[in-house]
């Protein structure tokens, strides 16, 4: 079942878990993977889940549902993480050098799935914030080795130039294993 935004939803910073969280009701809390060092300072003081947040969430949820074979709770988790990242992540500079230039460039729009190629491995990402030149992306795979002993974990963010984005291949057969 897909959940729809409610007026009671509110962002808060969960200090015990060191994560941005979304209160979904009295006894229901969604923990994002984002800690304070990746978030803008305003996110640490809480905020309402605004109409702008709801619009973004609904848009990416609809786009993800059409692209992923995952269960509703897994797709909701990805959509909520995209929403948190879109509104509360710190600005980043592109780190395109980790990835090969794509022969078939994918257009970047929020919630779209794309692939990046490190030269030794391909991985799926969701577009958090698609720009004209570069885009902020969220890793959907469990992990991705970038080289120089650097590894990305699921739901980590990276910004890259759009010439690195490739269309995803055979999405309906490959589920994302969400943590």
Swiss-Prot record:
GO terms for cellular component: cytoplasm. It is found in: Cytoplasm. It comes from the Bacteria. GO terms for biological process: division septum assembly; FtsZ-dependent cytokinesis. The keyword Cell cycle applies. Keywords: Cell cycle, Cell division, Cytoplasm, Septation. HAMAP family: ZapC. Belongs to the ZapC family. Interacts directly with FtsZ. Contributes to the efficiency of the cell division process by stabilizing the polymeric form of the cell division protein FtsZ. Acts by promoting interactions between FtsZ protofilaments and suppressing the GTPase activity of FtsZ. This is Cell division protein ZapC. The lineage of its organism: Bacteria, Pseudomonadati, Pseudomonadota, Gammaproteobacteria, Alteromonadales.
